[in-house]
Amino acid sequence: MLPYPQIDPVAVAIGPLQIHWYGLMYLVGIGGAWLLASRRLNKFDPTWTKEKLSDLIFWLAMGVIVGGRLGYVLFYDLSAYIANPLLIFEVWKGGMAFHGGFVGVMIAAWWFGKRNGKSFFQLMDFVAPLVPIGLGAGRIGNFINAELWGKPTDVPWAMVFPPFSDPAQLARHPSQLYQFALEGVALFIILNLYARKPRPTMAVSGMFALFYGIFRFVVEFVRVPDAQLGYLAWGWVTMGQILSLPMIIAGLFLIWLAYKRDPAASKAAA
């Protein structure tokens, strides 16, 4: 068993002002996305300025934050927010959902592309390889917060999370680190290697949806579901799996459609 590193969730405290590691992870994700995007900008569109890129990243970040919060409200704890709608604004207490953030990013990309002469999938193909930076950083934030841990296990790398998080004090899968490794590191490598060569429009977006969906679906088997939801079917299906399955199907369809529309790219890939 590995010891859980005791890290104060509050990174900096200045009087009543507290800056949490989880919030800083959002800044890491946004900043990392901007740096990588700026390196790829000339290949994407030589006419785009760094200012336009900054505008894009800003609106995508808004999509992540607003969509992530609304997604959590709708998918994971709707009854609590109906009973007390003001809870929606208490973001410092946690409650963000990737799938909601993903929808927010898609809406922001569609809106920004329409205003700047880019199609939805042109922008999504450009953005997709940037997303794992934020995903990985977010999972590290979850780990520091000692939240979203996994099921009890006797694997050698199991961890016992702090009593405030897990009163049962059981050795558990550090599922946040699994998601960091898969959704952050592995997905980053896959997408950025794949996007190095010219690909037909929609293909990179399809690869993102496919592999994120697979990685999330698999990790859900060892991650404890949200207490207010539990398992939704057959004693093992979680909300995360239900929301990830359409991503897998959509990813496969987008990849197939992308190469069907561009036979030359299909032959080159073969």
Swiss-Prot record:
Protein name: Phosphatidylglycerol--prolipoprotein diacylglyceryl transferase
GO molecular function: phosphatidylglycerol-prolipoprotein diacylglyceryl transferase activity
Entry keyword Cell inner membrane: yes
UniProt keyword list: Cell inner membrane, Cell membrane, Membrane, Transferase, Transmembrane, Transmembrane helix
Annotated residues for binding of a 1,2-diacyl-sn-glycero-3-phospho-(1'-sn-glycerol): R139
Record keyword Signal present: no
Taxonomic source organism: Pseudomonas savastanoi pv. phaseolicola (strain 1448A / Race 6)
BP GO annotations: lipoprotein biosynthetic process
One Pfam family this sequence matches: LGT
Annotated function: Catalyzes the transfer of the diacylglyceryl group from phosphatidylglycerol to the sulfhydryl group of the N-terminal cysteine of a prolipoprotein, the first step in the formation of mature lipoproteins.
GO CC terms in record: plasma membrane
Residue stretches spanning the membrane: 10-30, 56-76, 92-112, 120-140, 175-195, 202-222, 237-257
Membrane topology, from the record: Multi-pass membrane protein
HAMAP family: Lgt (MF_01147)
Family stated for the protein in its record: Belongs to the Lgt family.
Disulfide bonds: none
EC numbers for this chain: 2.5.1.145
Alphabetical list of InterPro entries matching this protein: Lgt
Metabolic or biological pathway, per its Swiss-Prot or TrEMBL entry: Protein modification; lipoprotein biosynthesis (diacylglyceryl transfer)
Compartments where found: Cell inner membrane
